[in-house]
Amino acid sequence: MQDPASPIHRRSLVGGLEAAGLVVLAASLPSQARAEGDAARKVFEQALPNLPGQVLTAVVVEYAPGGKSPPHRHDASASVFAYVLSGSIRSQVEGGEVAVYRAGQHWFEPPGAHHVVSENASGTEPASLLAVLIAAAGARLTVYDP
């Protein structure tokens, strides 16, 4: 079995996602940056004909060295799959353990989960992840804590 963190496995997965149309024209889409040192860029959105009322959305989140996302929740209808593209990401969903995921690793966040830690694990190197969300059409995908 191939190591999921190997460069060949990563290339296969990313190539497969590109072939599926998840990563398209990323450079031409607007970026949403927040003061904490991350930028989120929607790269794809598609209604799912086999799941009426559901939409798949792909977002690339880029973290500057030491950057982080503020605590947040995703819609109660949203399942989140996160795949680390580069660097290392420290993540914690409320009630769970803090974990560090490296390039090629992934995790799942259940609908409505409170994401209390999402940050670059390095203070010197950038990091990025691909978040793929499946949620109800029109759902507010991310709501930051006040």
Q: Which residues does each predicted region cover?
A:
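A short beta-loop-beta micro-motif enriched in histidine and acidic residues
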Residues: 54, 68-83
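N-terminal secretory signal peptides and thylakoid transit peptides that target proteins
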Residues: 2-24
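Glycine- and acidic-residue-biased ligand/ion/polar-headgroup-sensing regions
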Residues: 77-95, 105
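Ligand-binding loop in jelly-roll beta-barrel domains
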Residues: 112-139
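Short acidic-glycine-tyrosine-enriched beta hairpin
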Residues: 95-112
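C-terminal segment of N-terminal export signals and the immediately downstream linker at the start
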Residues: 27-53
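Conserved short histidine dyad/triad with adjacent acidic residue
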Residues: 59-75, 110-112
